[in-house]
C-alpha cells in the first residue's frame, strides 16, 4: 500500500521533561519518527518542552517548538503551521493525553487535522479502563475482576464486593502515578483518594489482586492491511505487584512452554485488532498464574512505550521508526529491515541471545522515603546487557548499573553479609525473610545472601515468588563460585562464559583474606582502601592470566534474524564464545564513552552530548564508536554511531573494546562522571584520552590541587578546609563559622552534600561521610548566604576561550545548580560583574589547558565574585545553552578535540541572544510521599524544561507551565513568608491582589500585609490545631497557589505538612522568594499582553539584541 499523499506535514508531539515513568526513551522514539518522516519528504513540525533532547535540535525537524505542551499552544501551532496530521504515539502518555485533550477541545476538527498512529477511539478503548474491559470480554480474553470508581463511595462498594487486597490503578496516568495496593481497611481510603486525585479524569480501576503471578509483555505491531507481527516477548523476573519499570526484565521470555507462548501471541493479535490500532505499535501486559497457567490481560499501551525502546534495542527492530512509517500509510511488507537490508519489517525478529534489563533507583536522594516497590514506578533509570545465556546477560546487567556491584554479588560489597553475620540465627532468618518478602531495590542481592546462608530454591521462591527457573540459574552461579574457590584459574573460561567480572574473580580468590581483614567490623569503609588495593592488584593478575591463556571476549552482532541473513549494521555485544563478528575496519576512529543508566545528577543531557559528538566525528569523516549500556537513549540507536557496543562502562569492558578496535583515542568528557572515573586507569593502560587531560581534570576536582590553581590566579573562593577525620572537620567548621557546606570530593549531582548549621549536625554527617566519599577527603566550605549563583559554560582550545553562556540562577545559592531555575542572559548582574566573570572563566580554562568544554559555578555576594566549582567537561546545561545560542556547542568541542582551533569555528565574537531563555527543573516528589520539598545542595530533579520569550517574566511563566504546574488565573493564594523576605516581596504580593486573586495569610504575614494596605484574610497555622488551617483549605481545593518561604529549620518543619499537601492535591507551591517574584512578574505580563510562540529556527534567525 503506497504512502498517503494527502499527508504532507505532520506535527509530532514529544513527551516533555524527564520524569519517573517517562524518560529518554521518548527522545529516542521521537527522533526516530522525525527522521523517518523527513526521509519520506514529509515536513516535520515538533512540539516538546525539553531542551535536553536530540529531537529538539533545530536541524532535525523543519519547525521545532520548545513550548508548553498545552492545548492553547497546540492551537497556535495549528493556526501557524497548518499540518495535515498529528502523531501522538511516540511521545508517551504526555503526548496521548494532550492529543485527547485537543480532540475534546474541538481544535482537531476546527483545523481539519487528523490523528495518525492511533485513532481517538482506539486510544480511548485502550486507556479507559471500562472500555478496555468490555473490549476484552467481547473477544473472550479474561481481565482481572474489577470495578470503576469516580469517588470514594463507589470505591467502598467495589471493595465490599471484591475484598482486599485490591490494586488501585488511576486512568490516564504515567508510570502508575497515583496507583497503589490497598492491603487493609486502614489504607484503603488513602490509596483510593490518592488515585482519584492523580487521574486527569478522576477515575480509578479497583482490581482483584494477582500478586505473585508471573508477568509478561509482548510488543506488537499492526498495519492497515491487518498484518500483525510480534516484535519481542519480555518476561519480568519480579512477579506481579511490582511495576514493570521497577522490575528486572528478560527478553525473550524464558519460562513459558511453547504452547503457553503461542497462546499469548494469539491473544495479543486478537487484542490489537479489537482495540483498533492499525498503524503502529502497542505494548500488551499479561499475568500468568504459575500454578495452573491461567492468563489475564492487565493492560495495553496503544503507543510506543518504555518497553518498546527496550524491545528495539534488544532485537535491533526500530519500532518507533516503523510505527511512524505505518502511520502515513505504508504496510509492514513495504518497509525494509535496516539491519539485513533484504528482509521486510513483516519478518518477525528472531534472536539467539538473552537480554536483561535492570532498573536503577535513587532512594538515597530522598531520605525517609519508603523503598518498597509496588504498582507506582520509582526507578529513575535502567541498564541493559546482552549475553549468550541468561547467566551472562544477568551478571553484565548488574555491573552496568554502576552502583559498585560487579555482578550477582561476590564483588567486594559486604554490608548485607556482615550485618547478617552480626545477628543470631533467628534474627538473621527474620531479617533475610523480610527482605525477600517485601519487594525492594536490593532484593536480588538478598536472594544471593539467602543462597549464601543455605536457603533452598523452594524456600526463596515461597518468600519472593520469583520463578524457580530464574532461581535455579542464580543458584548455578553460586555453585560455580564454589568450584572456582576449589579449582582456581583452571576454570577461568567457564567463569567468564557466565558473566563473572574480573572484580568478582578477584574477590573470590581473596575472600578469606578480606573477611579476616574485616573481622566482622560493620564499618567496611574503614578498611575500604586496603580492600580496594588488594582487589585491584588481584584483578590485574587475573587480566594477565586471561591474556596468557588467550581467554578474550568476542563480539557478536545484533542481526534481528539469529544469523539467518547477513547484518550490515555494526551493533555488538561481548561474549566468551567462538566466532568474532566485529570485523574491525582500518578507518580512522574515535571511541565515545556514554553515561550509562540515567540517575539523578546524570541524565539525558549527557546522552545528548555523546550523540552530538558522534555526529561531529561523522561530519569529519571519522568513524565513531559508541559504548553505552542505557536502552532508553538515542546514543544506543544503531544509526547514531558508526559502531555501537552495548556493554557495561567498567574498566575491564571498556579496555577490552579499546584493544579490539584500536581507535585513535577516547572521548570521556561528554558522559558525565561515569567516563571521568575511568580516565586515570585508562590512561595508565596506554589509552589516549582526547581533549582535556586526566591530570587537568584532577587539578579541578581534587580540592587541594584546585586551591593551588585559585591561589595562582588570585581568584576568590569561599573560605574552606579539607578534613580527613571528625576532629579535623570540627576544627575547620569552627574556624570558618557556621553555616558550612560539606561534601565529598569527586561527586556528581551534589551526592552527600549538605548545609550544616551546627556541630551536632556535623557529627551526624561525619558518621556516614567516609563511606560516601570513596576514600577522598571531606570538603568544608563557608556557605555564602544570600549570594547569587551563576553557571558558565565555555569552549577552549588551549589557547583561546569562548564563553557560550552565563546563566543567573533564580534560586539563591545553596540550592544545587541542577535543581535551580536559571535565566540566560542574566537579568540582575552588573556589566562590571559580567566582565569579571568572563575574565575569570578565560583564566581558569587556559590554566587548566582545557580542550573542549568547561563549566564553572560562581557565587556573587556584595559585588565580590567567588569560585564555587570548576568542571572541565560537558555540563548538564550544555543542551540548554546550545538551544538558546543557536550553535551546536558539543560539535564545536569535538572538533577542538580533533585538533581544530576556536578561530576556525563559525562562532560570533561573543555570546548573543535574540530572546530570554529560562531553564526550570522537574522534581519527582509526587513519587516519594513523605519527603520534604525544600531544596538544598543535593540534587533531586529528574528533568528540565525551557521557556523562551522576549522577557524574563514570560519565559519563567512558560517554564512553570512546562514543569507541570497548573497555574491559576484566578482564585486564592496562600501566603506565608519569612521576615527576611517580606519587604522585597511586598510589591509582588500587591500585584497578585491587583490581578484579582484573594489572599489568605498566617498571622505574621497577614499583619504585615494589612500594615501595608493589602487586603488578606487571616488563617490559623497548622500546629495551632484550630480549624480552619491552610491545610484544610488545600484539602477542600480552596487554595490555588502557595507562596511559602520558611527561613529556619523550625519554620520549615512547621510548614512541611503544607508542602506535602500541595504535592498531593496538585497545588503549585513556591518555596523561594526569587521564584515567587519571577512567577508573579510573568503572570502580570501574561495578563497584559498574552503569550507568543516561535520555532527555534525563527528565534535563531532573529536579530541578536541581548
Swiss-Prot record:
Q: Does the keyword Nucleus apply?
A: no
- Tell me the protein's name: Carbamoyl phosphate synthase large chain
Q: Which residues bind Mg(2+) 3?
A: 857, 869
Q: Does the keyword Ribonucleoprotein apply?
A: no
Q: Kindly state which reaction or reactions the protein catalyses.
A: hydrogencarbonate + L-glutamine + 2 ATP + H2O = carbamoyl phosphate + L-glutamate + 2 ADP + phosphate + 2 H(+)
Q: Which residues bind ATP 1?
A: 129, 169, 175-176, 208, 210, 215, 241-243, 285, 299
Location of region: Carbamoyl phosphate synthetic domain: 583-964
Question: Quick one: which residues bind Mg(2+) 4?
Answer: 869, 871
Q: How is the cofactor bound?
A: Binds 4 Mg(2+) or Mn(2+) ions per subunit.
Query: Which organism is this entry from?
Result: Leptospira interrogans serogroup Icterohaemorrhagiae serovar Lai (strain 56601)
Binding of Mg(2+) 2 occurs at 299, 301
Q: Where is the signal peptide?
A: none
**SUPFAM superfamilies in the cross-refs:** Carbamoyl phosphate synthetase, large subunit connection domain, Glutathione synthetase ATP-binding domain-like, Methylglyoxal synthase-like, PreATP-grasp domain
ATP-grasp domain residues are 133-328, 707-898
Q: Which NCBIfam families match?
A: CPSaseII_lrg, PRK05294.1
> E.C. number, please?
6.3.4.16, 6.3.5.5
What the entry lists under Pfam families is as follows: CPSase_L_D2 (PF02786), CPSase_L_D3 (PF02787), MGS (PF02142)
Q: Where is this region: Allosteric domain?
A: 965-1106
What does the similarity note say?
Belongs to the CarB family.
| Location of the region described as Oligomerization domain in the Swiss-Prot/TrEMBL record | 403-582
Q: What is the lineage of its organism?
A: Bacteria, Pseudomonadati, Spirochaetota, Spirochaetia, Leptospirales
Provide the top EC class: ligase
Amino acid at each position: 500500500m503506497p504512502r498517503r499523499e494527502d499527508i504532507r506535514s505532520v506535527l509530532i508531539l514529544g513527551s516533555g521533561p524527564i520524569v519517573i515513568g517517562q524518560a529518554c526513551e521518548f527522545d529516542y522514539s521521537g527522533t526516530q519518527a522525525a527522521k523517518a518522516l523527513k526521509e519520506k519528504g514529509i515536513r516535520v513540525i515538533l512540539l516538546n518542552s525539553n531542551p535536553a533532547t536530540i529531537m529538539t535540535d533545530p536541524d532535525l525537524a523543519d519547525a521545532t517548538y520548545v513550548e508548553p505542551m498545552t492545548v492553547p499552544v497546540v492551537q497556535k501551532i495549528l493556526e501557524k503551521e497548518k499540518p495535515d496530521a498529528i502523531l501522538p504515539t511516540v511521545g508517551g502518555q504526555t503526548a496521548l493525553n494532550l492529543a485527547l485533550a485537543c480532540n475534546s477541545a474541538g481544535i482537531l476538527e476546527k483545523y481539519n487535522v487528523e490523528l495518525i498512529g492511533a485513532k481517538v477511539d482506539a486510544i480511548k478503548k485502550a486507556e479507559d479502563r471500562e472500555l478496555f474491559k468490555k473490549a476484552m470480554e467481547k473477544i473472550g480474553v479474561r481481565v482481572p475482576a474489577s470495578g470503576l470508581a469516580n469517588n470514594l463511595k463507589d470505591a467502598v462498594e467495589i471493595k465490599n464486593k471484591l475484598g482486599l487486597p485490591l490494586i488501585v490503578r488511576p486512568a490516564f496516568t504515567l508510570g502508575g502515578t497515583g496507583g497503589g495496593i490497598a492491603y487493609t481497611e486502614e489504607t484503603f481510603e488513602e490509596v483510593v483518594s490518592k488515585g482519584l486525585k492523580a487521574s486527569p479524569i478522576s477515575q480509578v480501576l479497583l482490581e482483584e489482586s494477582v500478586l505473585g503471578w508471573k508477568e509478561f509483555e509482548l510488543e506488537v505491531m499492526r498495519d492497515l492491511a491487518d498484518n500483525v507481527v510480534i516484535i519481542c516477548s519480555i518476561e519480568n523476573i519480579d512477579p506481579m505487584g511490582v511495576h514493570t519499570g521497577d522490575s528486572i526484565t528478560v527478553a525473550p521470555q524464558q519460562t513459558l512452554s511453547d504452547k503457553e507462548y503461542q497462546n499469548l501471541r494469539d491473544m495479543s493479535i486478537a487484542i490489537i485488532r479489537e482495540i483498533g490500532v492499525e498503524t503502529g505499535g502497542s505494548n500488551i501486559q499479561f499475568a500468568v498464574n504459575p500454578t495452573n497457567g491461567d492468563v489475564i490481560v492487565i493492560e495495553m499501551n496503544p503507543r510506543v512505550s518504555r518497553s518498546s525502546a527496550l524491545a528495539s534495542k534488544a532485537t535491533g527492530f526500530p519500532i518507533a521508526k516503523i510505527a511512524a512509517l505505518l502511520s502515513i500509510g505504508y504496510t509492514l511488507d513495504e518497509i525494509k529491515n535496516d539491519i539485513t537490508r533484504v528482509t521486510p519489517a513483516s519478518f518477525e525478529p528472531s534472536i539467539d541471545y538473552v537480554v536483561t534489563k535492570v532498573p536503577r533507583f535513587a532512594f538515597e536522594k530522598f531520605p525517609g522515603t519508603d523503598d518498597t516497590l509496588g504498582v507506582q514506578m520509582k526507578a529513575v533509570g535502567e541498564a541493559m546487557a546482552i549475553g549468550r545465556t541468561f547467566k551472562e546477560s544477568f551478571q553484565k546487567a548488574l555491573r552496568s548499573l554502576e552502583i559498585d556491584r560487579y555482578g550477582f554479588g561476590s564483588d567486594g560489597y559486604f554490608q548485607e553479609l556482615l550485618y547478617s553475620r552480626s545477628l543470631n540465627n533467628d534474627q538473621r532468618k527474620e531479617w533475610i525473610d523480610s527482605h525477600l518478602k517485601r519487594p525492594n531495590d536490593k532484593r536480588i542481592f538478598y536472594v544471593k545472601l539467602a543462597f549464601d546462608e543455605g536457603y533452598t530454591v523452594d524456600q526463596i521462591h515461597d518468600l519472593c515468588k520469583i520463578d524457580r527457573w530464574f532461581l535455579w540459574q542464580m543458584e548455578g552461579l553460586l555453585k560455580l563460585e564454589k568450584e572456582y574457590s576449589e579449582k582456581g584459574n583452571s576454570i577461568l573460561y567457564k567463569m567468564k562464559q557466565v558473566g563473572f567480572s574480573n572484580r568478582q574473580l578477584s574477590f573470590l580468590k581473596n575472600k578469606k583474606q578480606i573477611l579476616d581483614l574485616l573481622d566482622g567490623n560493620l564499618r567496611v569503609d574503614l578498611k575500604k582502601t586496603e580492600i580496594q588495593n588488594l582487589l585491584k592488584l588481584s584483578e590485574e593478575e587475573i587480566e594477565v592470566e586471561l591474556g596468557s591463556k588467550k581467554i578474550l571476549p568476542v563480539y557478536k552482532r545484533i542481526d534481528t534474524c539469529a544469523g539467518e541473513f547477513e547484518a550490515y549494521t555494526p551493533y555488538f555485544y561481548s561474549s566468551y564464545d567462538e566466532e568474532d563478528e566485529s570485523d574491525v575496519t582500518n578507518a580512522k576512529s574515535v571511541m565515545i564513552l556514554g553515561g550509562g543508566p540515567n540517575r539523578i545528577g546524570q541524565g539525558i543531557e549527557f546522552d545528548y552530548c555523546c550523540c552530538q559528538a558522534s555526529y561531529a566525528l561523522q561530519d569529519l569523516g571519522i568513524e565513531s564508536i559508541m559504548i553505552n549500556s542505557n536502552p532508553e537513549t538515542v546514543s544506543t540507536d544503531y544509526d547514531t554511531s558508526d559502531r555501537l557496543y552495548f556493554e557495561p562502562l567498567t574498566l575491564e569492558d571498556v579496555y577490552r573494546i579499546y584493544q579490539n578496535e584500536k581507535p585513535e583515542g577516547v572521548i570521556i568528557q561528554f558522559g558525565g562522571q561515569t567516563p571521568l572515573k575511568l580516565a586515570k586507569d585508562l590512561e595508565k593502560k596506554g589509552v589516549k584520552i582526547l581533549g582535556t587531560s586526566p591530570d587537568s581534570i584532577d587539578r579541578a576536582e581534587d580540592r587541594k590541587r584546585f586551591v593551588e590553581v585559585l591561589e595562582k590566579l588570585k581568584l576568590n573562593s569561599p573560605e574552606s578546609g579539607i578534613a580527613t577525620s571528625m576532629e579535623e572537620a570540627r576544627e575547620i567548621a569552627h574556624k570558618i563559622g557556621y553555616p558550612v557546606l560539606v561534601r565529598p570530593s569527586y561527586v556528581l549531582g551534589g551526592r552527600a552534600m549538605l548545609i550544616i548549621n551546627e556541630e551536632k549536625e556535623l557529627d551526624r554527617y561525619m558518621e556516614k561521610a567516609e563511606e560516601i566519599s570513596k576514600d577522598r577527603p571531606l570538603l568544608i566550605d563557608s556557605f555564602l548566604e544570600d549570594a547569587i549563583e551563576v553557571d558558565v559554560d565555555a569552549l577552549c582550545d588551549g589557547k583561546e576561550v569562548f564563553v557560550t553562556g552565563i546563566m543567573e540562577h533564580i534560586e539563591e545559592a545553596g540550592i544545587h545548580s541542577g535543581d535551580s531555575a536559571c535565566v540566560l542572559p542574566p537579568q540582575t548582574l552588573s556589566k562590571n560583574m559580567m566582565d569579571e566573570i568572563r575574565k575569570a572563566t578565560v583564566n581558569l580554562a587556559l590554566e587548566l589547558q582545557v580542550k573542549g568544554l568547561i563549566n564553572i559555578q560562581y557565587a556573587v555576594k556584595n559585588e565580590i565574585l567567588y569560585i564555587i566549582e570548576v568542571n572541565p567537561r560537558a555540563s548538564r546545561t550544555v543542551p540548554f545553552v546550545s538551544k538558546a545560542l543557536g550553535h551546536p556547542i558539543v560539535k564545536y568541542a569535538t572538533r577542538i578535540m580533533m585538533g581544530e582551533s576556536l578561530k576556525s569555528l563559525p562562532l560570533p565574537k561573543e555570546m548573543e541572544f535574540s530572546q530570554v531563555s529560562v531553564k526550570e527543573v522537574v522534581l519527582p516528589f509526587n513519587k516519594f510521599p513523605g519527603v520534604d520539598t525544600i531544596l538544598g545542595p543535593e540534587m533531586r530533579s529528574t528533568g528540565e524544561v525551557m521557556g523562551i520569550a522576549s522577557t524574563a517574566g514570560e519565559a519563567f511563566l512558560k517554564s512553570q507551565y512546562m514543569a507541570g504546574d497548573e497555574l491559576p488565573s484566578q482564585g486564592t493564594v496562600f501566603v506565608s513568608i519569612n521576615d527576611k523576605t517580606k519587604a522585597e516581596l511586598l510589591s509582588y504580593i500587591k500585584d497578585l491582589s491587583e490581578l484579582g486573586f484573594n489572599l489568605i495569610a498566617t498571622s505574621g504575614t497577614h499583619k504585615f500585609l494589612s500594615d501595608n494596605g493589602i487586603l488578606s484574610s487571616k488563617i490559623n497555622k497548622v500546629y495551632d490545631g484550630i480549624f480552619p488551617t491552610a491545610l484544610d483549605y488545600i484539602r477542600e481545593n480552596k487554595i490555588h497557589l502557595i507562596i511559602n518561604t520558611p527561613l529556619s529549620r523550625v519554620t520549615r518543619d512547621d510548614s512541611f505538612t503544607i508542602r506535602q499537601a500541595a504535592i498531593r492535591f496538585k497545588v503549585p507551591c513556591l518555596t523561594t522568594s526569587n521564584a515567587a517574584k519571577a512567577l508573579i512578574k510573568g503572570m502580570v505580563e501574561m495578563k497584559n499582553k498574552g503569550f507568543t510562540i516561535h520555532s527555534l529556527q525563527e528565534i535563531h534567525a532573529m536579530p541578536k539584541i541581548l
